[in-house]
């Protein structure tokens, strides 16, 4: 049984229902963090707790008072279920195909595997083991509201050996397409007014990663990333801080 399968959402709750109905493997707890912050989708999400599901034992809906970002809700999934041996984290606009979850669990059962990715190392679906968090830390919440939090985490094990399973091997949908990211990012696609703010934040987050790990974190830039955050050997790779001024500059307004 999957101990916890978690997601977060800002808008368009029909995607979460689609995700929920696509579950075809036993799950102890399906948790949704409502990142809307405006009380626009509260009632629709609450109804999810009343929907019977053959494979899901518990449904938890957590309405956050304001948006804490992608890395913020990823960390909440980990913290709120701290005794889990692993956490299965997924974008709200994903839909599993039959057999996907069974295959993901099979890969996760390998004790040497630290992370299982959905496809080609993607982070729209991933399984994260507890010992990986112990060694490499939580996600960097400076990367509010979204983008680069996955790439940042990947830099932490550039200079060490971490066994990952890069693809589950069974297709799944992201948005309306299967096998690619062409219709992903449904948060800003569903609410175009957010697009500009999110894209600006994305660029700011890239510059933050330049400082933290060097521009070589990007695949097209030659060189090596720093072995320690901000090229400071006194700092462990698991270090997480919170630059309030930087985060405030990217605030979405809710």
Where are these predicted regions, by residue range?
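Short beta-strand-to-loop acidic/aromatic patch adjacent to the donor-nucleotide binding site
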Residues: 84-95
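C-terminal catalytic/acceptor-binding lobe
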Residues: 151-254
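Short, well-formed alpha-helical segments that are part of the catalytic scaffolds
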Residues: 11-25
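Aromatic-glycine-rich donor-binding/catalytic loop that engages nucleotide-sugar donors
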Residues: 128-147, 156-167
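Glycine-rich, basic loop-to-helix element that forms the pyrophosphate-binding segment
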Residues: 64-81
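Acidic donor-binding segment of Leloir-type glycosyltransferases
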Residues: 24-63
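Conserved donor NDP-sugar-binding/catalytic core segment of glycosyltransferases
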Residues: 94-125
């Amino acid at each position: 049984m999957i101990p916890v399968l978690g997601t977060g959402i800002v808008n368009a709750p029909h995607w979460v229902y689609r995700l929920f109905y696509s579950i075809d493997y036993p799950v102890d707890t399906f948790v949704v963090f409502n990142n809307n912050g405006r009380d626009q989708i509260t009632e629709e999400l609450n109804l999810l707790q009343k929907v019977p599901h053959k494979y899901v034992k518990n449904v938890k809906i957590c309405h956050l008072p304001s948006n804490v970002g992608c890395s913020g809700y990823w960390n909440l999934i980990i913290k709120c279920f701290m005794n889990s041996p692993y956490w299965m984290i997924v974008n709200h606009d994903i839909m599993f195909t039959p057999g996907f979850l069974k295959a993901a669990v099979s890969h996760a059962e390998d004790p040497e595997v630290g992370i299982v990715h959905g496809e080609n190392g993607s982070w729209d679906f991933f399984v994260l083991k507890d010992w990986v968090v112990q060694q490499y830390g939580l996600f960097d919440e400076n990367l509010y509201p979204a983008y680069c939090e996955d790439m940042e985490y990947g830099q932490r094990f550039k200079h060490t050996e971490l066994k990952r399973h890069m693809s589950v091997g069974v297709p799944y949908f992201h948005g309306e397409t299967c096998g690619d990211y062409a219709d992903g990012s449904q948060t800003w696609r569903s609410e175009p007014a957010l697009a500009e703010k999110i894209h600006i934040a994305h660029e700011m987050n890239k510059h933050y990663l330049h400082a933290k790990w060097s521009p070589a974190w990007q695949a097209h830039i030659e060189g090596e990333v720093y072995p320690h955050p901000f090229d400071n050997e006194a700092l462990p790779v698991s270090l997480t801080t919170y630059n309030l001024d930087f985060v405030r500059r990217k605030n979405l307004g809710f």
